[in-house]
A protein has these predicted regions:
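Select subsegments of transmembrane alpha-helices in polytopic membrane proteins
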Residues: 155-160
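C-terminal transmembrane module of polytopic alpha-helical membrane proteins
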Residues: 1-13, 20-22, 168-238
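Extracytosolic (periplasmic/ER-lumenal) interhelical loops and adjacent juxtamembrane/interface segments
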Residues: 34-59
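Alpha-helical transmembrane bundle and helix-membrane interface signal
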Residues: 83, 141-153, 199-206
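Alpha-helical transmembrane segments of multi-pass membrane proteins
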Residues: 24-36
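Transmembrane helix-loop-helix
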Residues: 3, 13, 54-138, 169, ...
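Structural signal for the C-terminal ends of transmembrane alpha-helices
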Residues: 30, 76, 80, 139-144, ...
Length: 238
Protein backbone atom coordinates (compact mmCIF):
# COMPACT_ATOMS: atom_id res chain seq x y z
CA UNK A 1 0.00 0.00 0.00
CA UNK A 2 1.36 3.43 -0.98
CA UNK A 3 0.37 6.95 -0.05
CA UNK A 4 0.95 10.21 -1.88
CA UNK A 5 0.65 13.83 -0.85
CA UNK A 6 -0.46 16.39 -3.40
CA UNK A 7 -0.61 15.98 -7.19
CA UNK A 8 2.77 14.26 -7.50
CA UNK A 9 6.26 15.09 -8.82
CA UNK A 10 6.93 18.17 -10.89
CA UNK A 11 6.59 17.90 -14.68
CA UNK A 12 9.26 19.73 -16.73
CA UNK A 13 7.57 23.09 -17.43
CA UNK A 14 6.34 23.60 -13.88
CA UNK A 15 9.78 22.71 -12.55
CA UNK A 16 11.41 25.27 -14.87
CA UNK A 17 8.84 27.94 -13.99
CA UNK A 18 9.46 27.46 -10.28
CA UNK A 19 13.23 27.64 -10.79
CA UNK A 20 12.87 30.82 -12.87
CA UNK A 21 10.68 32.46 -10.23
CA UNK A 22 13.04 31.53 -7.40
CA UNK A 23 16.08 32.81 -9.32
CA UNK A 24 14.27 36.07 -10.11
CA UNK A 25 13.33 36.46 -6.44
CA UNK A 26 16.95 35.99 -5.35
CA UNK A 27 18.16 38.52 -7.92
CA UNK A 28 15.59 41.14 -6.88
CA UNK A 29 16.46 40.54 -3.24
CA UNK A 30 20.01 41.66 -4.00
CA UNK A 31 19.10 44.41 -6.49
CA UNK A 32 15.53 45.54 -5.67
CA UNK A 33 15.71 48.34 -8.24
CA UNK A 34 15.08 45.72 -10.93
CA UNK A 35 11.46 45.64 -9.78
CA UNK A 36 10.86 49.11 -11.23
CA UNK A 37 12.32 48.06 -14.56
CA UNK A 38 10.66 44.66 -15.01
CA UNK A 39 7.48 44.95 -12.92
CA UNK A 40 4.22 45.97 -14.62
CA UNK A 41 3.57 49.70 -14.42
CA UNK A 42 1.03 51.06 -16.93
CA UNK A 43 2.67 54.50 -16.90
CA UNK A 44 5.91 52.91 -18.13
CA UNK A 45 4.22 50.65 -20.68
CA UNK A 46 2.25 53.49 -22.26
CA UNK A 47 4.59 56.39 -21.58
CA UNK A 48 8.01 54.80 -22.04
CA UNK A 49 7.11 51.80 -24.21
CA UNK A 50 8.42 49.23 -21.73
CA UNK A 51 6.64 46.54 -23.71
CA UNK A 52 8.41 43.67 -21.96
CA UNK A 53 6.74 44.37 -18.63
CA UNK A 54 3.47 42.43 -19.36
CA UNK A 55 5.65 39.30 -19.54
CA UNK A 56 8.47 39.90 -17.06
CA UNK A 57 6.22 40.97 -14.18
CA UNK A 58 5.06 37.36 -13.83
CA UNK A 59 8.48 36.27 -12.56
CA UNK A 60 8.81 38.91 -9.83
CA UNK A 61 7.35 38.73 -6.32
CA UNK A 62 6.97 41.23 -3.54
CA UNK A 63 8.06 38.94 -0.73
CA UNK A 64 8.87 35.39 0.30
CA UNK A 65 5.30 34.55 1.29
CA UNK A 66 4.03 35.90 -2.02
CA UNK A 67 6.47 33.66 -3.89
CA UNK A 68 5.74 30.57 -1.79
CA UNK A 69 1.97 30.96 -2.14
CA UNK A 70 2.11 31.28 -5.93
CA UNK A 71 4.55 28.42 -6.38
CA UNK A 72 2.47 26.18 -4.13
CA UNK A 73 -0.64 27.01 -6.15
CA UNK A 74 1.28 26.41 -9.40
CA UNK A 75 2.20 22.96 -8.13
CA UNK A 76 -1.25 22.12 -6.76
CA UNK A 77 -3.29 23.14 -9.80
CA UNK A 78 -0.73 22.91 -12.58
CA UNK A 79 0.69 19.39 -12.33
CA UNK A 80 -2.43 17.55 -13.51
CA UNK A 81 -3.08 20.15 -16.20
CA UNK A 82 0.42 19.83 -17.68
CA UNK A 83 0.14 16.04 -17.65
CA UNK A 84 -3.24 16.22 -19.36
CA UNK A 85 -2.42 18.95 -21.92
CA UNK A 86 1.24 18.32 -22.51
CA UNK A 87 4.06 20.75 -21.77
CA UNK A 88 3.73 22.90 -24.89
CA UNK A 89 0.02 23.65 -24.49
CA UNK A 90 0.41 24.18 -20.76
CA UNK A 91 3.19 26.72 -21.25
CA UNK A 92 1.17 28.57 -23.89
CA UNK A 93 -1.87 28.71 -21.62
CA UNK A 94 0.25 29.91 -18.70
CA UNK A 95 1.60 32.85 -20.68
CA UNK A 96 -1.77 33.64 -22.27
CA UNK A 97 -3.39 33.99 -18.85
CA UNK A 98 -0.44 35.87 -17.36
CA UNK A 99 -0.25 38.34 -20.24
CA UNK A 100 -4.05 38.51 -20.29
CA UNK A 101 -3.98 39.54 -16.64
CA UNK A 102 -1.48 42.26 -17.51
CA UNK A 103 -3.64 43.43 -20.42
CA UNK A 104 -6.64 43.71 -18.10
CA UNK A 105 -4.60 45.82 -15.71
CA UNK A 106 -3.43 48.06 -18.54
CA UNK A 107 -6.95 48.57 -19.90
CA UNK A 108 -8.49 49.29 -16.50
CA UNK A 109 -5.70 51.75 -15.74
CA UNK A 110 -7.26 53.94 -18.44
CA UNK A 111 -10.77 53.77 -16.94
CA UNK A 112 -11.40 56.42 -14.26
CA UNK A 113 -14.33 54.51 -12.73
CA UNK A 114 -12.02 51.54 -12.07
CA UNK A 115 -9.53 53.66 -10.15
CA UNK A 116 -7.53 54.09 -13.30
CA UNK A 117 -5.33 56.97 -12.19
CA UNK A 118 -4.08 55.13 -9.13
CA UNK A 119 -3.69 51.90 -11.09
CA UNK A 120 -1.86 53.75 -13.86
CA UNK A 121 1.06 54.57 -11.58
CA UNK A 122 1.00 51.42 -9.45
CA UNK A 123 3.48 48.54 -9.76
CA UNK A 124 2.15 45.01 -10.21
CA UNK A 125 4.33 41.92 -9.76
CA UNK A 126 3.68 38.22 -9.31
CA UNK A 127 2.49 35.08 -11.08
CA UNK A 128 -0.98 35.36 -9.53
CA UNK A 129 -2.70 36.21 -12.83
CA UNK A 130 -1.40 33.04 -14.47
CA UNK A 131 -2.09 31.03 -11.31
CA UNK A 132 -5.71 32.20 -11.29
CA UNK A 133 -5.92 31.11 -14.91
CA UNK A 134 -4.72 27.65 -13.87
CA UNK A 135 -7.27 27.62 -11.07
CA UNK A 136 -10.04 28.34 -13.57
CA UNK A 137 -8.87 25.52 -15.86
CA UNK A 138 -8.68 23.17 -12.87
CA UNK A 139 -12.27 24.03 -11.97
CA UNK A 140 -13.43 23.43 -15.54
CA UNK A 141 -11.67 20.09 -15.99
CA UNK A 142 -12.03 18.77 -12.43
CA UNK A 143 -15.22 20.50 -11.22
CA UNK A 144 -15.99 18.14 -8.36
CA UNK A 145 -12.44 17.77 -7.09
CA UNK A 146 -12.34 19.07 -3.48
CA UNK A 147 -10.20 22.09 -2.65
CA UNK A 148 -9.64 22.65 1.05
CA UNK A 149 -10.38 26.22 2.08
CA UNK A 150 -8.00 27.20 4.91
CA UNK A 151 -6.91 23.52 4.81
CA UNK A 152 -10.11 22.60 6.67
CA UNK A 153 -13.29 23.00 4.63
CA UNK A 154 -13.58 20.95 1.40
CA UNK A 155 -15.21 22.85 -1.47
CA UNK A 156 -15.74 21.47 -4.99
CA UNK A 157 -13.34 23.16 -7.39
CA UNK A 158 -16.13 24.67 -9.51
CA UNK A 159 -17.57 26.52 -6.50
CA UNK A 160 -14.14 27.56 -5.30
CA UNK A 161 -13.48 29.21 -8.67
CA UNK A 162 -16.81 31.05 -8.43
CA UNK A 163 -15.94 32.31 -4.96
CA UNK A 164 -12.49 33.61 -5.84
CA UNK A 165 -13.87 35.10 -9.06
CA UNK A 166 -16.53 37.02 -7.14
CA UNK A 167 -13.97 38.18 -4.57
CA UNK A 168 -11.63 39.39 -7.31
CA UNK A 169 -14.42 41.21 -9.14
CA UNK A 170 -15.82 43.10 -6.17
CA UNK A 171 -12.36 43.76 -4.73
CA UNK A 172 -11.26 45.30 -8.02
CA UNK A 173 -14.04 47.86 -7.56
CA UNK A 174 -13.03 48.74 -4.03
CA UNK A 175 -9.89 50.80 -4.47
CA UNK A 176 -6.41 50.14 -3.12
CA UNK A 177 -5.73 47.12 -0.94
CA UNK A 178 -2.15 46.21 -1.83
CA UNK A 179 -3.43 43.18 -3.79
CA UNK A 180 -3.63 43.13 -7.60
CA UNK A 181 -7.26 42.03 -7.84
CA UNK A 182 -7.49 43.34 -11.40
CA UNK A 183 -4.71 40.94 -12.43
CA UNK A 184 -6.51 38.06 -10.70
CA UNK A 185 -9.72 38.92 -12.51
CA UNK A 186 -7.83 39.26 -15.78
CA UNK A 187 -6.23 35.84 -15.38
CA UNK A 188 -9.64 34.24 -14.84
CA UNK A 189 -11.13 36.06 -17.82
CA UNK A 190 -8.23 35.28 -20.15
CA UNK A 191 -8.34 31.61 -19.15
CA UNK A 192 -12.07 31.34 -19.76
CA UNK A 193 -11.88 33.04 -23.16
CA UNK A 194 -8.95 30.86 -24.20
CA UNK A 195 -10.64 27.61 -23.18
CA UNK A 196 -14.30 28.39 -23.90
CA UNK A 197 -14.38 31.43 -26.17
CA UNK A 198 -15.46 31.57 -29.85
CA UNK A 199 -11.85 31.27 -31.01
CA UNK A 200 -11.51 27.95 -29.22
CA UNK A 201 -14.62 26.49 -30.86
CA UNK A 202 -13.54 27.80 -34.26
CA UNK A 203 -10.06 26.31 -33.91
CA UNK A 204 -11.52 23.00 -32.72
CA UNK A 205 -13.79 22.88 -35.77
CA UNK A 206 -10.87 23.76 -38.06
CA UNK A 207 -8.68 21.08 -36.46
CA UNK A 208 -11.45 18.48 -36.85
CA UNK A 209 -12.01 19.30 -40.53
CA UNK A 210 -8.27 19.38 -41.24
CA UNK A 211 -7.77 16.00 -39.58
CA UNK A 212 -10.71 14.57 -41.53
CA UNK A 213 -9.23 15.92 -44.78
CA UNK A 214 -5.86 14.35 -43.96
CA UNK A 215 -7.49 10.97 -43.28
CA UNK A 216 -9.45 11.05 -46.54
CA UNK A 217 -6.36 12.14 -48.45
CA UNK A 218 -4.34 9.29 -46.95
CA UNK A 219 -7.02 6.79 -47.86
CA UNK A 220 -7.05 7.95 -51.49
CA UNK A 221 -3.28 7.93 -51.63
CA UNK A 222 -2.87 4.41 -50.33
CA UNK A 223 -5.84 2.81 -52.05
CA UNK A 224 -4.92 -0.41 -53.81
CA UNK A 225 -6.14 -0.63 -57.35
CA UNK A 226 -6.42 -4.13 -58.83
CA UNK A 227 -6.05 -4.46 -62.57
CA UNK A 228 -7.31 -8.01 -62.84
CA UNK A 229 -8.30 -11.02 -60.81
CA UNK A 230 -5.40 -13.21 -59.84
CA UNK A 231 -2.80 -10.94 -61.44
CA UNK A 232 -0.18 -8.95 -59.48
CA UNK A 233 1.25 -7.25 -62.54
CA UNK A 234 -1.20 -4.33 -62.67
CA UNK A 235 -1.58 -3.67 -58.95
CA UNK A 236 -0.49 -0.18 -57.90
CA UNK A 237 -0.12 1.48 -54.51
CA UNK A 238 -0.24 5.29 -54.60
Amino acid sequence: MSYSLGPGPLPPIIRKLIIANVVAFLVTSVTPGIMLWFGLRPADVFGRLHLWQPVTYMFLHGGLFHLLFNMLALWMFGVELERMWGSRYFLRYYFVTGVGAAATTLVLSLVPMAGGEQLYYSLTVGASGAVYGLLLAYGLYFPDRPIYLYLIFPIPAKYFVMIVGAISFFSSLGGASGVAHTAHLGGLLAGYLYLKGPRTRLMAEFAYRFEKWQINRSRRRFDVYTGGRGSDRDKRIH
